[in-house]
């Protein structure tokens, strides 16, 4: 009887605190609803004033020794069950939890045994006991004011729990999901902080389409990751049916890629998926490239072009004969004239032949042409043909002139590019199409004597990669003029007398080096001959292939 009074007191106090609702048992729809959320984890906060026993840690908030102690006989609370000793019945069915987001089916329905008694709770359960529980086996509930035990659900996205969500709000939540062991789709939750308050930073691949982080299932392609709903064709926005094609870092299905980027046949205007034929600046399907006369397929056969159409040789000849019988013949190309033509000097010519022989401009209405030596020129090119233009001032030359470097010059304008002094019949040198006097040519482009550092104008002596004036090619030791037989020491020429005066070890090293240089030179010559031989064979092979192609045409 005493136990019943204690239980009823606990129920009354819990109801006053708003911890117990006396509503009916939740429906099956309410129980299924939270299965699509991620169950949060729990933190039990320890305190030095908490006494522990089997089943859990508790916070003692009562200053008058009203805290909860844990004995081996304390029973756990399930849905609607509050027990104080072994074998006690529940005080009333239908206990509802007060925490945020509590799944109604998450409260433990089993009463623990005497040795494992602890308060078990589901996500979001906030449970308070109005009176402290005294120590001892099945001793029941003692008097005194105490806040009891509070178990708080840890929200993975914030330290404070959020208010309960209705069914519509729960459906609007969009969290990454996974399949649990029984095949149920469960949401994946991300912890924002650790139990000790440290910030947890999410880390995942970036979607190549939207740029957001991917949490959950992703699709990898071409070194990028995508949300499954974003791995679609760039053009039609439909998922790929097996394969895709990449173009300029964008993904397309095969049909859209062919429609957007494949070349199109000039004849049928349809995309070319496989082999194509390039002819007359256009592309064709092999089956569409046919003779305009007889319709035969021209793949692998010679053909001729006429007025933008292709013909086989037979149809080409037959067409020319038909046109020649009723058309004029061009006096320039000797071919029939089928369209517009011009009478030039009493002879018909194609209109495309009525143009300047030099610059190719057409003689349109109002533009006159000039004939010179049987050819037609515009006025500007005609003046160039009948007049000599100075290569320096670009003005006509009347009177004396100098012809040099493929141009005609006024005598006073044919000067050194550097000093502007006229050559007046003296010798000059050319570099990059420009004339230079001897001194400035050798100053800028000539080689200098290794000994006196002056340009070598005429012939010099070149040895050891250097050039000398003939009179400056002397022995480094005795300054005598050297002949053909010389020795080298440190890149400098020596006569035999000075060479023999060198130490024996030095002479030995010099001779070994000279022998090595000769051997290397011989090897380089051998390689050069081999390369020249291979180059000759390559040119002969290219000439043969070109000849075969010309015969095929």
From Swiss-Prot:
Signal peptide: none annotated. Pfam families: LIM (PF00412). Its main location: cytoplasm. PROSITE patterns: LIM_DOMAIN_1, LIM_DOMAIN_2. Disruption phenotype: Cells exhibit an aberrant actin cytoskeleton and numerous F-actin-enriched microspikes. Cells aggregate poorly and aggregates arrest at the mound stage. They exhibit poor adhesion, form weak cell-cell agglomerates in suspension, do not polarize in chemoattractant gradient and move very poorly. Residues 205-262, 263-322, 328-387, 388-447, 448-505 form the LIM zinc-binding domain. Residues 43-115, 534-553 are annotated as: Disordered. Gene3D superfamilies: Cysteine Rich Protein (2.10.110.10). It is found in: Cytoplasm, Cell cortex; Cytoplasm, Cytoskeleton. Regulates and controls rearrangements of the actin cytoskeleton. Required for tip formation, morphogenesis, cell adhesion and motility, chemotaxis and aggregates formation. May function downstream of paxB. Residues 99-114 have a biased composition (Low complexity). CDD domains: LIM, LIM4_PINCH. Keywords: Chemotaxis, Cytoplasm, Cytoskeleton, LIM domain, Metal-binding, Repeat, Zinc. GO terms for cellular component: cell cortex; cytoskeleton. GO terms for biological process: aggregation involved in sorocarp development; bleb assembly; cell adhesion; chemotaxis; culmination involved in sorocarp development. This is LIM domain-containing protein B. GO terms for molecular function: zinc ion binding. SUPFAM superfamilies: Glucocorticoid receptor-like (DNA-binding domain). InterPro entries: PINCH-1-4-like (IPR017351), Znf_LIM (IPR001781).
């Amino acid at each position: 009887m005493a136990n019943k009074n204690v239980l009823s007191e606990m129920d009354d106090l819990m109801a006053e605190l708003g911890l117990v609702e006396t509503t009916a048992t939740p429906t099956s729809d309410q129980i299924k609803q939270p299965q699509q959320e991620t169950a949060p984890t729990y933190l039990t906060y320890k305190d030095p004033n908490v006494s522990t026993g089997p089943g859990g840690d508790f916070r003692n908030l009562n200053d008058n020794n009203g805290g909860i102690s844990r004995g081996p006989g304390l029973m756990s609370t399930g849905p609607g069950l509050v027990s104080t000793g072994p074998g006690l019945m529940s005080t009333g069915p239908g206990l509802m939890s007060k925490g945020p987001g509590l799944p109604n089916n998450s409260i433990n329905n089993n009463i623990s045994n005497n040795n494992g008694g602890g308060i078990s709770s589901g996500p979001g359960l906030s449970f308070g006991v109005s009176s402290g529980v005294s120590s001892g086996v099945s001793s029941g509930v003692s008097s005194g004011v105490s806040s009891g035990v509070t178990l708080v659900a840890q929200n993975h996205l914030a330290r404070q729990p959020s208010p309960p969500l209705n069914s519509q709000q729960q459906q609007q939540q969009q969290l990454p999901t996974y399949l649990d062991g029984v095949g149920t789709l469960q949401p994946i939750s991300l912890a924002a902080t650790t139990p000790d308050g440290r910030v947890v930073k999410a880390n995942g691949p970036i979607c190549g389409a939207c740029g957001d982080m991917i949490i959950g299932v992703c699709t990898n392609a071409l070194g990028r990751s995508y949300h499954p709903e974003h791995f679609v064709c760039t053009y039609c926005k439909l998922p790929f049916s097996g394969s895709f094609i990449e173009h300029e870092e964008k993904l397309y299905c095969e049909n859209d890629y062919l429609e957007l980027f494949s070349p199109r046949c000039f004849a049928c205007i349809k995309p070319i998926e496989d082999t194509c034929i390039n002819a007359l600046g256009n592309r064709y399907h092999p089956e569409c490239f046919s003779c305009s006369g007889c319709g035969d397929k021209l793949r692998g056969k010679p053909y001729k072009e006429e007025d933008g159409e292709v013909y086989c040789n037979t149809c080409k000849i037959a067409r020319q004969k038909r046109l020649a019988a009723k058309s004029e013949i061009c006096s320039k190309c000797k071919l029939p004239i089928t369209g517009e033509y011009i009478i030039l000097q009493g002879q018909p010519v194609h209109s495309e032949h009525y143009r300047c022989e030099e610059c190719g401009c057409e003689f349109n209405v109002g533009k006159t042409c000039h004939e010179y030596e049987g050819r037609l020129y515009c006025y500007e090119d005609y003046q160039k043909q009948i007049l000599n233009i100075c290569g320096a001032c670009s003005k006509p030359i009347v009177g004396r002139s100098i012809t040099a470097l493929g141009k005609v010059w006024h005598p006073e304008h044919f000067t050194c590019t550097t000093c502007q002094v006229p050559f007046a019949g003296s010798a000059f040198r050319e570099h990059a199409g420009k004339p230079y006097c001897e001194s400035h040519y050798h100053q800028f482009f000539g080689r200098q004597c290794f000994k006196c550092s002056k340009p070598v104008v005429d012939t010099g002596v070149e040895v050891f990669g250097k050039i000398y004036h003939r009179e400056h090619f002397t022995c480094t030791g005795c300054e005598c003029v050297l002949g053909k037989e010389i020795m080298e020491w440190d890149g400098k020429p020596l006569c035999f007398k000075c060479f023999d005066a060198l130490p024996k070890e030095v002479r030995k090293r010099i001779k070994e080096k000279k022998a090595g240089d000769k051997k290397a030179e011989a090897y380089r010559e051998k390689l050069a001959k081999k390369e020249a031989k291979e180059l000759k064979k390559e040119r002969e092979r290219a000439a043969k292939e070109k000849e075969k192609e010309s015969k095929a045409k």
